[in-house]
């Protein structure tokens, strides 16, 4: 795992799961995509901060659980610079905590799910339409199963009448 790195940015010291737990998620995603070197910034922020980011970049004036920013290498940057950098993930722990309670999920399980979700966005996965969402959700379910975490979408499907 020496070639996989998460830069934790948690200036206000919000409570988060162990770094090893999240690094294991990165390892799973990297292995699945045959990635041997990867670096990610994980920014831990308040609800107010993520609401501002959500408004600025997604035109949604409300807090959200996670926002991912895939790294786009600027033209002219030498190939050997930032080759392994996937991008930035911003997470609001208070939103995750509320969601976990509302959905009767273990908090660490929900963290792992949402972090994997964000990592997949950095690799180009999306859920803009039903087909893309199905591909992304199925991959999340598969990766979470390797961590011993149940399908996080089952309860939501039942609530949504799917």
Swiss-Prot record:
Keywords, ordered alphabetically: Cytoplasm, Endonuclease, Hydrolase, Metal-binding, Nuclease, Ribosome biogenesis, rRNA processing, Zinc
Enzyme class: hydrolase
Chief location of this protein within or outside the cell: cytoplasm
Gene Ontology cellular component annotations, sorted alphabetically: cytoplasm
GO BP terms: rRNA processing
Its EC number(s): 3.1.-.-
Function: Single strand-specific metallo-endoribonuclease involved in late-stage 70S ribosome quality control and in maturation of the 3' terminus of the 16S rRNA.
NCBIfam families: rRNA maturation RNase YbeY
Stated name of the protein: Endoribonuclease YbeY
Species annotation: Francisella tularensis subsp. tularensis (strain WY96-3418)
Gene that encodes it: ybeY
């Amino acid at each position: 795992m020496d070639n996989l790195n998460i830069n934790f940015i948690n200036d206000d010291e919000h409570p988060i799961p162990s770094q090893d737990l999240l690094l294991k998620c990165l390892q799973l995603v990297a292995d699945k995509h045959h990635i041997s070197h990867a670096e990610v910034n994980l920014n831990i922020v308040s609800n107010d901060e993520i609401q501002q980011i959500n408004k600025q970049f997604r035109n949604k004036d409300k807090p959200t659980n996670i926002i991912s920013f895939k790294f786009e290498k600027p033209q002219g940057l030498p190939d050997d610079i930032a080759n392994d950098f996937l991008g930035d993930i911003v997470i609001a722990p208070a939103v995750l905590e509320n969601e976990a309670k509302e959905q009767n999920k273990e908090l660490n399980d929900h963290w792992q799910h949402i972090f994997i979700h964000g990592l997949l966005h950095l690799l180009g996965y999306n859920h803009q339409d039903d087909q893309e969402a199905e591909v992304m959700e199925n991959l999340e379910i598969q990766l979470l199963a390797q961590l011993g975490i149940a399908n996080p979408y089952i309860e939501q499907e039942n609530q949504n009448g799917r």
